[in-house]
């Protein structure tokens, strides 16, 4: 099957895909998936919060926002040796990438050397690295690239025309600017959003349209299901229909055929059957481990059991002799993390 990568999708086309009969949509998405990936392979990453809580932003979904009473207290940036110990555990459990998230609006310049040290140490272990630290300027993006960072996560969260219902402390253009800085220095991008925040299907179409018409498709696209945390404004929101979530995965796969599509936050509450439908619809990446920053995630044993039942296997790593890396660094074609639970 020949699949053309397009950047000129219009919303009517994407809306028409959403409206297809469910079996037809899954057939199309699975066909696109098979054209670019081994459908039996799923990329596995581990995510660690290296700086938890105390964020000054007002994202309505986030338990790390300091203005909400969620029981999450502000903590200082972790020491590098503690991060390395967690990375070592992740590698032993089978992860091929280690993702580091910090609850910042944007890092201060004094924080960058500390994060750079974490990146260098984790890469020296043979893991790929990703980070999500909030908004970056051009100089900060360059410093992270020079430290050896592989991917940077910065989500759009939702459609441009629903954004003001969720966030007021950061503009949509701010997110696009950070993505531009990241692309300009040659970092790979991880960018997706969250569904189940009270948005309509048209808003979900709008999010995918914004992602699929970026100058370059994100290398990985995390699709997060809202994790409702008491104390956040979105707690108590009507849950999204499970089939609508699968449709979101399927249309993302069709619109961005060469991107990794990741099941991110909210997977703990998903049945094995729902996850299987998502894999059939084109999802090919998950986070491994019992926690995503401050919210739960399926434990490793459950994921291993699900992989065995479905005949899936973790994506294998390859060697990439990139110029900024140390000789012998091990790489994998995989995805990245996020600064809050919604990769999220």
Swiss-Prot record:
GO terms for molecular function: 2 iron, 2 sulfur cluster binding; 4 iron, 4 sulfur cluster binding; biotin synthase activity; iron ion binding. It is an enzyme of class 2 (transferase). Residues 40-267 form the Radical SAM core domain. Its EC number is 2.8.1.6. [4Fe-4S] cluster binds at residues 55, 59, 62. InterPro entries: Aldolase_TIM (IPR013785), BATS_dom (IPR010722), Biotin_synth/BioAB (IPR002684), Biotin_synthase (IPR024177), Elp3/MiaA/NifB-like_rSAM (IPR006638), rSAM (IPR007197). Pathway: Cofactor biosynthesis; biotin biosynthesis; biotin from 7,8-diaminononanoate: step 2/2. Gene3D superfamilies: Aldolase class I. Keywords: 2Fe-2S, 4Fe-4S, Biotin biosynthesis, Iron, Iron-sulfur, Metal-binding, S-adenosyl-L-methionine, Transferase. Its cofactor is [4Fe-4S] cluster; [2Fe-2S] cluster. Binds 1 [4Fe-4S] cluster. The cluster is coordinated with 3 cysteines and an exchangeable S-adenosyl-L-methionine. Binds 1 [2Fe-2S] cluster. The cluster is coordinated with 3 cysteines and 1 arginine. GO terms for biological process: biotin biosynthetic process. It catalyses: (4R,5S)-dethiobiotin + (sulfur carrier)-SH + 2 reduced [2Fe-2S]-[ferredoxin] + 2 S-adenosyl-L-methionine = (sulfur carrier)-H + biotin + 2 5'-deoxyadenosine + 2 L-methionine + 2 oxidized [2Fe-2S]-[ferredoxin]. It holds the Pfam family BATS. Catalyzes the conversion of dethiobiotin (DTB) to biotin by the insertion of a sulfur atom into dethiobiotin via a radical-based mechanism. PANTHER family: BIOTIN SYNTHASE, BIOTIN SYNTHASE, MITOCHONDRIAL. Homodimer. Belongs to the radical SAM superfamily. Biotin synthase family. NCBIfam families: bioB. This is Biotin synthase. It comes from Xanthomonas campestris pv. campestris (strain ATCC 33913 / DSM 3586 / NCPPB 528 / LMG 568 / P 25).
